[in-house]
Amino acid sequence: MEGIFAAYVLPALIIALKSVVLLVVLLIVVAYLLYADRKIWAAVQLRRGPNVVGPWGLFQAFADLLKFVFKEPIIPSGANKGVFLLAPFISAVLAMATWAVIPVNESWAVANINVGILYIFAISSLEVYGVIMGGWASNSKYPFLGALRSAAQMVSYEVSIGFVIVTVLLTVGSLNLTDIVLSQNTGLGTMLGLPASFLDWNWLCLFPMFVVFFISALAETNRPPFDLVEAESELVAGHMIEYSSTPFLLFFLGEYVAITLMCALMTVLFLGGWLPPVDVWFLSWVPGIIWFMLKLCFCFFLFAMVKAFVPRYRYDQLMRLGWKVFLPISLFMVVATATFLKVFGLA
């Protein structure tokens, strides 16, 4: 009996505990990133932003949570009730499930699997189904148009993101996210005789792919200037028009968790994960999770600034950018990287 407990029950309990801790921390982080997003946007527009609930408005996100939870969920009379309620649940759960393999520090992941990046790409590809189901089940034109746009947009930019990831995998030689971070201890900087630093991270040697990944991540998560799925001036709120109360909250949560995931992926693939910017003793003393969170917040700040400054693209411009600009660039970089590694015997 003790052998069964040690072999099966205890590992399952540990994974369940890790998952609960990850979920709680993730929801708190998302709440304050949403607060930061609103504050940054307000500052750009010379407004104060959230400033009533708690000191400096720090508890505004939790007040919004209570507001949504206690509202009555309204289901349109012509909607497919089962699919209508299932769609936001799928969107939120899939977005949170991808975080299981993200290492916020060395050996700090719910599941440190050897195909971590493949797992993320597979799960995130399924998130579009939540949007499509919600748009179709609402039995309304605007949500359906938003869902159709979402399907085309996400599929288009997943291609570019996939080739960016292939380029990183060629340079690292592993699908394990921890290995990808540790490989950035050495790079261009150390080849020039400098100590390990931010010059070794992949953002420098793969800078074109870093830019492609950043812009594609904006499109993949429906962030401005690529928020055609829920364009307020055209579709009011896109696939979420008919949603209210907790179902709307789940869609909104899934969207911001996906944004946070893209920021974390950018940190892991290009910004050295939990590695300090310079390998000196007083920076190495800082816990790796602190560096990871600082880099994640920096990436989110870039997302917020793009939202504040860049006007929305037309739909044809969005598609042209994905298929006629990013796809050729990413394909060329895959071929160029593979050729470079083969010619110089680094493969």
Swiss-Prot record:
Domain of life: Bacteria
Listed transmembrane segments: 13-33, 50-70, 82-102, 115-135, 161-181, 198-218, 248-268, 286-306, 325-345
Alphabetically ordered keywords of this record: Cell inner membrane, Cell membrane, Membrane, NAD, Quinone, Translocase, Transmembrane, Transmembrane helix, Ubiquinone
InterPro entries xrefs: NADH_UbQ_OxRdtase_su1/FPO (IPR001694), NADH_UbQ_OxRdtase_su1_CS (IPR018086)
Pfam families the record matches: NADHdh
GO molecular-function term, one example from the UniProt record: NADH dehydrogenase activity
GO CC terms: plasma membrane
EC top class named in words: translocase
Membrane topology: Multi-pass membrane protein
Catalysed transformations (reactions): a quinone + NADH + 5 H(+)(in) = a quinol + NAD(+) + 4 H(+)(out)
Record keyword Cell membrane present: yes
GO biological process, one term: aerobic respiration
EC number: 7.1.1.-
Compartments in which it is found: Cell inner membrane
Family per record: Belongs to the complex I subunit 1 family.
Quaternary structure annotation from Swiss-Prot or TrEMBL: NDH-1 is composed of 14 different subunits. Subunits NuoA, H, J, K, L, M, N constitute the membrane sector of the complex.
Function: NDH-1 shuttles electrons from NADH, via FMN and iron-sulfur (Fe-S) centers, to quinones in the respiratory chain. The immediate electron acceptor for the enzyme in this species is believed to be ubiquinone. Couples the redox reaction to proton translocation (for every two electrons transferred, four hydrogen ions are translocated across the cytoplasmic membrane), and thus conserves the redox energy in a proton gradient. This subunit may bind ubiquinone.
Protein name stated in the entry: NADH-quinone oxidoreductase subunit H
Gene: nuoH
